């Protein structure tokens, strides 16, 4: 199983304890609502678990489904892979606010995620995420 398949498996399973094996010890996480990069496996897990709580459970059979009539609203709608990095575009809705964003993920030769960057639009989405993530963290 490659790194992206493992990532999809982790978020589908709703068991984020599997993040331990997927993240490099020195992974760097870039949040759309925090100015400084968050360095290290433990803090990255904290942010990813909080994001999972905010976005809700993923219950669809195909996480890349774009059928808006199925399951929860979070879904990846585009995947671009180049070597050891990927751009995963997603859309979701939180508190009635449409969120469009990308996860930029890079990994090393062992398949461990070394960088995870989240970019979100529009401004209302960033503002809402900031408020909600503060409450969760």
Q: What are the residue ranges of the model-derived segments?
A:
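C-terminal and inter-domain tail/linker signature
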Residues: 1-137
């Amino acid at each position: 199983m490659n790194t992206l398949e493992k990532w999809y498996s982790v978020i589908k399973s709703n068991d984020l304890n599997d993040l331990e094996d997927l993240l490099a010890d020195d992974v760097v996480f870039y949040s759309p609502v925090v100015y400084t990069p968050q360095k290290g496996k433990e803090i990255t897990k904290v942010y990813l678990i909080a994001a999972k709580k905010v976005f809700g459970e993923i219950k669809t059979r195909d996480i890349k489904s774009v059928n808006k009539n199925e399951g929860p609203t979070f879904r990846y709608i585009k995947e671009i892979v180049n070597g050891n990095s990927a751009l995963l575009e997603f859309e979701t809705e939180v508190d009635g606010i449409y969120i469009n964003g990308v996860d930029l993920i890079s990994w090393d030769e062992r398949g461990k995620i070394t960088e995870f960057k989240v970019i979100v639009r529009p401004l209302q989405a960033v503002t809402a995420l900031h408020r909600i993530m503060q409450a969760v963290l």
